[in-house]
């Protein structure tokens, strides 16, 4: 796992993952909630998000001119990747066409026939990702890939998105299990404090107070 990817996972576990009883936008209930926007709209989190998504796109060999997704979850991801790459344009997909002005549903990049990547923050049922895929294709984009930041591994979301994406592929940066495991590591008070050399927190860069399991400052140890 790259350093940017590990740092992004740590930030998601610290800022975005919560245990408890929650009602999801899908209507279901869950014993945990992941609000990715607290990470993707964080100054450092935005940079890491852009780096990790850009790295994944390069590794997949997806040749795209733009990146976009359904508002609101995709918005900060789109902006982050566009800024980090300096070459991928961004577009946003409205949940419905505007009832005024141009009445368009796609905002931003507007080149019909262009190759694009669809992104989302969390995939549960996959409904928002599928809406973006369908809107992008209806507009005239050529979708070469679809991505989400965290896949919840439930509600048959992944198979649904994979089916909608064909012939393109769908990938997730992290699974909810990975984020949960990292969160549990961060909140485990039984972890010992072991230092051989001076270190800084991998999340914020401040002096670390522990390096087990990873370098953390006092604020990010729990």
Language-model-detected regions and their locations in the chain:
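Short glycine-rich phosphate-binding loop at a beta-alpha junction
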Residues: 62-73, 147-148
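Conserved acidic residues
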Residues: 65, 114, 144
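Short cysteine-rich clusters marking metal-coordination/redox-active sites
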Residues: 201-204, 217
């Amino acid at each position: 796992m790259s350093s940017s990817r590990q740092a992004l996972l740590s930030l998601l576990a610290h800022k975005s993952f919560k245990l408890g009883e929650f009602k999801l936008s899908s209507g279901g209930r869950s014993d945990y909630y992941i609000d990715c926007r607290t990470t993707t709209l964080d100054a450092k989190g935005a940079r890491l998000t852009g780096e990790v998504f850009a790295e994944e796109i390069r590794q997949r060999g997806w040749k795209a001119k733009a990146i976009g997704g359904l508002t609101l979850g995709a918005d900060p991801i789109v902006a982050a990747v566009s800024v980090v790459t300096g070459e991928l344009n961004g577009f946003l997909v409205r949940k419905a066409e505007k009832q005024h002005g141009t009445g368009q549903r796609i905002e931003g990049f507007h080149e019909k026939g262009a190759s694009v990547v669809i992104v989302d923050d969390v995939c549960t049922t996959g409904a928002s990702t599928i809406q973006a895929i369908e809107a992008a294709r209806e507009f005239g984009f050529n979708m070469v890939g679809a991505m989400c930041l965290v896949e919840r591994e439930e509600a048959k979301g992944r198979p649904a998105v994979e089916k909608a994406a064909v012939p393109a592929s769908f990938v997730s940066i992290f699974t909810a299990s990975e984020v949960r495991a990292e969160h549990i590591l961060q909140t485990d008070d039984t972890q010992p404090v072991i230092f051989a050399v001076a270190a800084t927190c991998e999340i914020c860069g401040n002096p670390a107070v522990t390096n087990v399991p990873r370098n953390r400052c006092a604020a990010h140890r729990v």
